[in-house]
Amino acid sequence: MIACLTAANLVAAVRLVHDILSNNKLFANNANGLLATGGVIWATNVIAFALWYWDLDRGGAAARAHYPQANPAFVFPEMLHTDYVPANWVPKFVDYLSLGFWTATAFSPTDISAIKPWAKLLMVSEAAVSLVIAALVVARAINILA
């Protein structure tokens, strides 16, 4: 299911980039439509990658529930500051959603570090897609409004 969401969003992103680069008339004078479309694709990208992080880290949510400390791919601040969290703390979906949001917004890790190669590659992929969408959509919208 996550793969379907990711594939559909990738197709939408590629079509949007193609429409922008080919000067498609769909967004010729419609900055609001362009920004809304880009925003939906960007937000879906954040959610899709958050789902990937959540599903793949430590074997998924079910495996984390049984073996919370088993082989993490990400180091969360709560893992380093154990005085401030319960002893049995494990990451929840909101932790992976914040990872997805900050990766897409800052184009880099913030307070959550990837320590497995696959996790680093996922973060690079998410940041690259977000950068392309943000740069092209904002540049084209400014061009339309100017």
Each language-model region and where it sits:
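Pore domain of cation channels
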Residues: 91-146
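Hydrophobic alpha-helical transmembrane segments and immediately flanking/interface helices
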Residues: 31, 35-40, 68-73, 107-124
